[in-house]
Every structure is written in structure tokens, then in C-alpha cells.
């Protein structure tokens, strides 16, 4: 069969587009790109449902035990434990910023945000970094037994990225999870599924926050982690698979050491989220520091509030454990209870089911409508004599989301009793 010149030109253009990954059909473009190069890991509400960010608040075992109608499982290793368990959860996202009840067991399915987001890394081939000050010796961290105390950072999370440097960060408040980034390098003595590990980190409330990152954001997060002295081991493939752009690789290699920094860092990430990094040697009360960095905004925070407690403060409270690099903080209320679905929930620290290990905060007034997801508890000292006490003497990260709908929803969750001044 004989073809004319216009047809041959068109055929050449179609073939060229196919090999270059370009097409006028968006679905074809996506398929061609996927064949050439793995897409970036992203926050997922469920398998196949990417979002810019999500936040999960796992409820406590006293008020919302077990998984509701869900059945507990161990998709990332381990065995279902018989300890006090609560894997009911509420969540919000960039797609729908109002907190709502989730279904199933948090972290154990591909239809919940935690399980779906972590699963793409654990069962995939991405680069990853895990840090946690409470690995409980699996993996073993040189110089630490069971956990790494002060002056190591009080920080936990997962960073995952592709070879172009794009990916996501997931901040967690859970001790001993996650502690293995891929099924090729599982934990040696424990599981890696919520509710299926030796430590009961699903009895009290916990929080999880995941955020989409571009390559520059990944660099910023790594600088923030280094400044905060996070606990990791770049030489151990169980928790680090280093790759991608050279500047990212170099920053990863430099982690797992204690920083000498006394300077807080702030980064404006591409998704509109602000990141704050507190170094361990900046010996100030953590949430007063956040208030000051955000312009003296008044905050309400729910953390593991336990000895040595930092009391509720007003804008006129004297804070002697302070640094000249910081402006004056606003009021910081300590939430000791909240409410969900008409039920009161405990928001203090403690070793019984009606307690809280999440670290979340919200602005109380002003135009910014901040929701804050942090690494650090309100434990330490306002005015000494030991200004390096507890969390004052440790590092950590805070993610600040400015969204009026989310802020209203978080504020409602932690509205309740307040610690005295």
C-alpha cells in the first residue's frame, strides 16, 4: 500500500511523541511516563487517591477502642497483640479539610491514609529515610540503649523520594513505628505494623501528618532534620535507602549526629506549609518558641503533658528560659481534654488508655488560622533553674498549615479543659 507524504509526516510525529512520553491524550501520557520512570511517592488517602497533605488523629483506647467495625491485621509484619488497642481515627486533607471519622484500622489497610501512604514505600522501590528517638533497639542505634534521650532530637517520621528528588514527608508521634522502610529489609525482632509491634503505641492518642514535597522541599526538610539532631543511621538499609540527586544524598549522609546549632530554622515549603526546626541547644519551651516565630500568636496545644509540665501561659507571663533571637511569645494554653463525636477525650500524658501522645496545636485568634503538627511536648521549664530540662533541651520539627477550615476543625477537637497557669 502506498502512503502520501502528509500521512508519513503524521506517523513520524506520533512515533516521536510515543518514545518521548508525550501525547495529546492525558491517560496515554501518564501510562508512557509510568513505563519509563516510577512516579513520585505521595500522601494517599487510600490506594490511588493522592492529596497534597493529610492529617490523622488516632483516638485513644478508653473512648474509642479497637477498630470499630474493622478487623486488625499486620500487613507490614508482626503479630496482632492483645494489649489495649485503639486504631479508630479521624482525618482531614487538602481535598477535604474538615476532620471526619475514618473506617477500618489506622495503618493496617490500603484504604486508610497511614497504611496506603506507608505501603507504597514499604512495598515499592523508592528512596527513604526513617528517624525515631525510640526505636527500642530494632534497629540498634550506636550509643543508645532502647531509646535516645537528650540532647538527641525528640522527632519521628519518614521521608520518601524518587530519583528526581520528589516525594513526601510523614511526621508521626508513635514510638517504634515505622522502623523499617522496605520489605526487603524488615525489622529483625519485631513487626512494622501499627498494633502488631511489642511496644503498645496504639493505646493512647497519636497523630500523623503527611505532606507532598518537591525536590527543593526535600532539601529543606533534610536541613531541618539535621538542625534538630534526629536519630537515624544512614548506613543501615533497614531505615535508609539513599539515592536521587547528589545534594539530597549528601544531606542524608550527614544525619544521625548531634548538631551544635543554637539557631531555629524556618522554611516556606511549596505547598504553602511553613516548617520550623528547633535545635536541641536552643533551650527554650517549645510551643512558646513556635508562638514567637509565628509573630506572637496565641496558641492552644495538646501534647504528652506530663512531668515536668510547662503550665499554661499568657502573653504577659515571664519566660526566663529564652533566647534573644526570639521575639515575645503570645499566650499558650495547654489542652487537657477535648471532644469528638460528643465524647470527652483525655489530652494529657500518662500510661493509661485515656491519654494523649499526639502533638497538635491551633491558633486562637488572628487572621492566620494556623494548625500546627509538631514533634515536641510541653515539658520542660519556663524560667529555670535548668533551662535545658526535658523538651527544652531537645530538637524537633513543627509543620504549620494555614487553612481556616482545618483550623476550625482542630480547634473544636481540642476544646475542653485547660491546664492552670
PLM feature spans:
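Bacterial N-terminal signal peptides that target proteins for export
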Residues: 1-8
Amino acid at each position: 500500500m502506498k502512503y502520501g507524504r502528509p500521512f508519513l509526516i503524521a506517523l513520524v510525529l506520533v512515533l516521536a511523541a510515543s518514545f518521548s512520553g508525550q501525547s495529546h491524550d492525558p491517560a496515554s501520557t501518564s501510562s508512557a511516563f509510568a513505563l519509563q520512570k516510577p512516579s513520585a511517592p505521595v500522601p494517599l488517602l487510600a490506594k490511588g487517591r493522592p492529596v497534597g497533605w493529610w492529617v490523622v488523629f488516632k483516638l485513644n483506647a478508653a473512648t474509642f477502642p479497637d477498630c470499630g467495625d474493622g478487623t486488625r491485621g499486620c500487613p507490614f509484619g508482626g503479630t496482632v497483640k492483645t494489649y489495649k488497642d485503639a486504631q479508630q481515627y479521624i482525618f482531614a486533607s487538602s481535598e477535604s479539610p474538615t476532620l471526619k471519622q475514618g473506617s477500618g484500622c489506622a495503618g493496617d489497610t490500603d484504604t486508610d491514609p497511614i497504611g496506603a501512604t506507608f505501603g507504597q514505600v514499604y512495598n515499592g522501590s523508592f528512596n527513604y529515610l526513617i528517624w525515631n528517638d525510640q526505636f527500642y533497639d530494632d534497629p540498634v542505634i550506636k550509643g543508645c540503649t532502647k531509646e535516645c534521650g537528650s540532647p538527641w532530637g525528640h522527632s519521628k517520621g519518614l521521608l520518601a523520594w524518587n530519583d528526581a528528588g520528589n516525594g513526601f514527608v510523614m511526621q508521626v508521634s508513635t514510638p517504634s513505628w515505622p522502623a523499617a522502610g522496605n520489605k526487603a529489609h524488615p525489622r529483625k525482632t519485631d513487626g512494622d505494623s501499627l498494633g502488631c509491634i511489642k511496644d503498645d503505641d496504639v493505646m493512647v492518642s497519636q497523630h500523623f501528618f503527611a505532606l507532598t514535597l518537591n525536590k527543593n522541599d526535600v532539601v529543606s526538610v533534610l536541613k531541618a532534620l539535621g538542625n534538630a539532631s534526629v536519630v537515624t543511621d544512614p548506613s543501615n538499609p533497614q531505615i535508609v535507602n539513599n539515592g536521587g540527586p547528589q545534594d539530597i544524598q549528601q544531606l542524608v549522609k550527614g544525619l544521625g549526629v548531634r548538631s551544635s546549632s543554637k539557631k531555629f530554622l524556618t522554611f516556606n515549603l511549596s505547598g504553602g506549609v511553613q516548617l520550623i526546626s528547633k535545635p536541641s541547644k536552643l533551650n527554650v519551651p517549645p510551643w512558646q518558641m513556635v508562638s514567637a516565630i509565628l509573630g506572637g500568636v496565641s496558641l492552644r496545644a495538646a501534647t504528652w503533658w506530663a512531668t515536668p509540665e510547662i503550665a499554661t501561659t499568657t502573653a504577659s507571663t515571664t519566660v526566663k528560659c529564652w533566647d534573644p533571637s526570639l521575639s515575645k511569645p503570645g499566650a499558650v494554653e495547654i489542652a487537657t481534654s477535648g471532644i469528638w463525636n460528643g465524647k470527652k477525650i483525655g489530652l494529657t500524658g500518662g500510661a493509661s488508655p485515656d491519654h494523649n501522645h499526639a502533638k497538635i496545636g491551633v491558633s486562637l485568634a488572628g487572621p492566620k488560622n494556623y494548625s500546627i503538627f509538631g514533634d515536641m511536648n510541653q515539658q520542660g521549664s519556663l524560667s529555670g533553674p535548668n533551662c535545658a530540662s526535658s523538651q527544652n533541651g531537645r530538637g524537633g520539627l513543627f509543620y504549620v498549615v494555614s487553612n481556616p477550615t482545618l483550623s476550625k476543625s482542630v480547634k473544636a477537637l481540642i476544646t475542653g479543659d485547660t491546664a492552670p497557669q
